[in-house]
Amino acid sequence: AASGENTIILDAGANATVSITPAKASLFPAPSDIVVLQAEIPERANAEALAWAHSFGARVLLNLAPARPTDPALMARTDILVVNETEAGLTLGMPAPASPMEAIGVARALRGLGPKHVMVTLGADGAAWASGSEAGHCPALTLGEAVDTTGAGDACVGALAAAMALGKPFDEAVADGIRAGSTAVLAPGAAPSYAALPRVTRA
């Protein structure tokens, strides 16, 4: 778009048939692992994957993108919830937050639905987060000229999950996610623009 934001067209196709059977047959999560789920597959598959991951003691990150009505029981059992500001508003049935301060309140409200940790991404305004009784705002980073925003959200989620798996506190993991997303926009494409973990994490 002229604003510099990307436009995404989704055709569910094979996503609608996703099953966790292959994962059950070949993957054995460790308690330190983070299993990442997202909303482009059936909620039934996500619910099964969450139960499977928890049976190994692993934690589950749900990236509720695109936003859709979600079973309260699934939300309550989610360890880490990641949404953008539009998805946050839709999930709560309210307008998207208009400022980082409003977004902190929204993150707290989403935390009240059950997830232990919540990140609300705000594009050029960084992200708001809530974890336990704490909440805050992580500013965006400008590392250079933005070339292509495609995949920035996925890079952010991946780095957040990796940082959590390494045992980082949630606010530091959010900062790593922001840095990964900010790095991803510096080059065209999705996966080719992703940076290796050492480049996006802070010691």
Language model features by range: what are they?
Residues 41-47:
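Active-site-adjacent beta->alpha loops and helix N-cap segments on the catalytic face
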Residues 47-135:
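Conserved phosphate/ATP/ADP-binding segment of small-molecule kinases
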Residues 8-11, 136-139, 160:
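Beta-strand scaffold of nucleotide-dependent catalytic cores
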Residues 1-34, 200-203:
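Conserved N-terminal subdomain of the carbohydrate kinase-like
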Residues 37-39, 63:
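Glycine- and other small-residue-rich loops at beta-strand/loop junctions that grip anionic moieties
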Residues 109-124, 132, 140-203:
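Conserved post-catalytic alpha-helical subdomain immediately downstream of the catalytic base
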Residues 14-20, 60-67, 141:
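Short gly/ser/thr-rich secondary-structure transition/capping motifs
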Residues 2, 84, 153:
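Short, conserved phosphate/pyrophosphate- and ester-handling motifs at nucleotide-, phospho-/glycolipid
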